[in-house]
Amino acid sequence: MGKHIKLRLIVMNILQWAIWGAYLTSMGNYLVQVGLGPKIGLFYAMQGIVSIFMPALMGIVADKWLGATKTLALCQFIAGAAMLGAGLYAASVESGAIAAGMKVAEMFSFPLFMSLYTISVAFYMPTIALSNSAAYGILEQNGYDTVKDFPPIRVFGTVGFIASMWIMNFCKTSAGTSFQFTYHQFIISGVIGLVLVLYCFTLPKIKKAETQGQSLMDALGLSAFKLFRDKQMAIFFIFSMLLGVALQITNGYATPFISHFQGLPEFAESWGAKNATAIYSISQIAETLGILLIPFAMKKFGIKNVMLIAMLAWVLRFGLFGLGDTGSGVWMLILSCIVYGVAFDFFNISGSLYVNERTSGSVQNSAQGLFMLMTNGIGATVGTLSAQAIVNHFTYSETVMVNGEEMVFTMGDWSTCWYIFAGYALVVAILFFILFKAPAKDAPKLV
């Protein structure tokens, strides 16, 4: 029975993360094709905006009324249906454009597509926490230790994410175009989401626990703002927001950047230029491995140095993209993806652990909510919108013939964009080194 429960949760995690992996890193390539390249930042910023309040709201729904599993199914149904609708709309526009002899970009409605996308991500983002809560509840009811038994199950979520990325990269339309450039990524994401809805109803029921009536202020992390009275905690949260700026930049712009080498004659036939999503998937593999380094790093270096390593890793992440190409410089793109494991994990997970160690009592959950608000909410939103302005300033859209088919790429001075991002991360790292002082091991917890 035990292995059976774990296997069922593994399947749930594979589906949960395959939904996101289908479009998160390749959506930029599609948006460029339909004339929305200059608006890539808006799509990724929307994920940050809805992350500010939707997970908290749906968490309250789960706690007070439906429970984690049913709320997960409800959210996935709305998210999956909206994403499927976005994909089917995009497919209909493409068919209409071909019939009318027009370009897809000339017929594409940004407001309609963006509305469907927004509904989808608004209800998908809460499912990340809800799927974790459902897994915790099922494991605990069956006598498992969540700290020990959940991480190996969660790893399969990353496997699902990577599998979706590879499907988008290597599957092609009848015309030979990779799914990373087409609407198929949204349809596949929506279908997987609806499959997960059905799967949720087969999961074991979780006994409803007595709730402590967490308020919306607590769920959003707003009640934890009193922690700003502690100078070093305030500095930590401010720098969490400043580094959060970097989190979604490469998700939005890495694949359009790598793909643009197809528009340069000297790189047009290189494997890397044609397989941007596959190259980028190395980042997700590195992220999984990076988690394993955290316990050692935290013990060896302490929170300040681990966070500093993460910031310097972001400098390398961006700088290597600025130096690399898909020819002889492809190793720099690969190294950048490997570095991502340290850049992401050493910041996100170590930061969360630090918040947990420094707080106690009723403020602990709110403090975690505040950390998420500062990083994935405010920081990521500001970061993607700022990146959009920078990329739009230094690049332009250009139509190129690839294997007899018109393709649109974002051409221009990409290197300067990456150097600006790297410079920003370096300035943040230097200021963090100067201003943040790690508390003593015996420092009292904040309440």
Task: List PLM regions with ranges.
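Cytoplasmic membrane-interface "Motif A"-like loop-to-helix N-cap segments
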Residues: 63-77, 299-311
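C-terminal ends and interior cores of transmembrane alpha-helices
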Residues: 77-107, 312-326
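Cytoplasmic helix-loop-helix junction between adjacent transmembrane helices
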Residues: 118-156
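Multi-pass alpha-helical transporter architecture, strongest
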Residues: 57, 86-91, 192-205, 407, ...
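Juxtamembrane intracellular "pre-TM" segments in multi-pass secondary transporters
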Residues: 1-3, 204-237, 263-268
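A membrane-interface helix-boundary motif in multi-pass transporters
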Residues: 170-191, 389-425
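Helix-loop boundary and gating motifs at the non-cytosolic
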Residues: 1-52, 232-265, 275-276, 348
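Central cavity-lining transmembrane alpha-helices of secondary-active solute carriers
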Residues: 42-63, 278-294
